[in-house]
Amino acid sequence: MKIAVLALQGAFIEHERMLEKLGAECFEVRQLADWQQPKDALVIPGGESTTQLKLLKDLALLEPVREYIEHGGAVFGTCAGLILLSKHVQGEEFDRISTMNTEVCRNAYGRQLGSFYAEAEMNGVGVVPMTFIRAPYIKSVEAPAEALAVVDGHIVAARQGRQLVTAFHP
């Protein structure tokens, strides 16, 4: 399996290391030429969503990524990736990838000092370790999206077709 990892900013190295431990072949997407490589899936890592969005636009990657997902490409977005994939972000109106029927609250768990670790049941997976770093949470999902995990009454993982998002870092 060949996985493209968006490597513009954020925790892309950590995602690559884990994917490689699982036997996947990874390559970094830093520019449009990288995006042209064949891929089985895309990972959008945690980081700063506004910085990632600016770079996606500046590097002419936003539309190709959106089209890939809209045409059935598999994607996993963590933390900032969740924000970029969500159609709605509470209190914000600007263009994102916006392919997932979710509404998100940014930085919902507060500042860096509010970061925490939890373990919770994830539908179809079992108990999953979850690291929340200035994390968002999913306020609501609309069909065909479905909630997969809840922590303290907040949705922290969801899927829609071949899209998977988590508020936490795996």
What do these predicted regions represent?
Residues 43-44, 77, 166:
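Redox-cofactor binding/interface segments in oxidoreductases and associated redox assembly factors
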Residues 35-38, 70, 141-142, 159:
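Flexible, charged surface loops at secondary-structure boundaries
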Residues 49-120:
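Cysteine-nucleophile active-site neighborhood
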Residues 26-27, 75, 163:
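Hydrophobic anchor at the start of a short beta-strand
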Residues 106-170:
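Amide-donor transfer/coupling interface in amidating biosynthetic enzymes
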Residues 1-58, 63-68:
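N-terminal beta1-alpha1 cap of cysteine-dependent amidohydrolase-like domains
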Residues 12, 35, 84, 91, ...:
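Flexible, glycine-rich phosphate/dinucleotide-binding loops
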